[in-house]
């Protein structure tokens, strides 16, 4: 068997030098990166562990405070919602009751009209029955008449439309006459009573 001759040409020599330079540059870059990582590690370990614990506790306390505030806000919203729902249920039907009040007024006017003959008296009895049933239905749902005649004037439930001088029968700030009845829905004024007040 013949031996192969190993001769180096100038091109081979130049390629070898280029490979060597590239390896050297890569090695230097790796050393620089390692050195930078070591510096960062030294800086990280240079931070005081006690300070880290203090910082973390402060962050934890801040998060706990945020959580407590959020929970308190949720509880407040739930309570507010319950109160609003209770008020809605309590005053349910307020609009309907207000709309029915003029009907009551008209029935009262019809009852105040004198009935001369028997047909009118029969009609009046029918109106009385309707009026009574309507009042019972309203009372059943918490609608009551405002106390007025002879009572002390209360601007929350009375509306003064006229004043008269004070006399022995009517002391100052008392209701002398009711011109239109007022009504309450539970503890809320549906319509104030229109009254004449002694002053």
Swiss-Prot record:
Can you name one GO molecular function term for this protein? protein-folding chaperone binding
A cellular component term from Gene Ontology for this protein is: cytoplasm
Please give the SUPFAM superfamilies that the UniProt record associates with this protein: Coiled-coil domain of nucleotide exchange factor GrpE (SSF58014), Head domain of nucleotide exchange factor GrpE (SSF51064)
Domain of life the protein comes from: Bacteria
Q: Which family does it belong to?
A: Belongs to the GrpE family.
- In this chain, composition skew of type Low complexity spans 11-46
Annotated transmembrane regions? none
Q: Where does the record place the region Disordered? A: 1-50
Protein name according to UniProt? Protein GrpE
**Complex and partners:** Homodimer.
Q: Which HAMAP family match?
A: GrpE (MF_01151)
* GO biological processes: protein folding
């Amino acid at each position: 068997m013949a031996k192969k001759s190993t001769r180096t040409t100038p091109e081979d020599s130049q390629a070898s030098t280029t490979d060597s330079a590239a390896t050297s540059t890569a090695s230097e870059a790796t050393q620089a990166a390692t050195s930078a990582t070591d510096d960062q590690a030294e800086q990280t370990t240079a931070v005081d562990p006690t300070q880290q614990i203090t910082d973390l506790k402060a962050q934890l306390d801040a998060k706990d405070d945020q959580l407590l505030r959020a929970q308190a806000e949720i509880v407040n919203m739930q309570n507010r919602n319950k109160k609003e729902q209770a008020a809605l249920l309590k005053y349910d039907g307020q609009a309907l009751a207000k709309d029915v009040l003029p009907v009551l007024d008209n029935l009262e006017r019809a009852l105040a009209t004198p009935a001369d003959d028997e047909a009118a008296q029969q009609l009046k009895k029918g109106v009385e029955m309707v009026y009574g049933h309507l009042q019972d239905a309203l009372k059943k749902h918490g609608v009551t008449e405002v106390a007025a005649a002879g009572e002390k004037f209360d601007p929350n439930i009375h509306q003064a439309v006229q004043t008269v001088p004070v006399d022995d029968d009517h002391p100052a700030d008392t209701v002398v006459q009711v011109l239109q009845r007022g009504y309450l829905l539970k503890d809320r004024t549906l319509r104030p009573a229109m009254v004449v007040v002694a002053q």
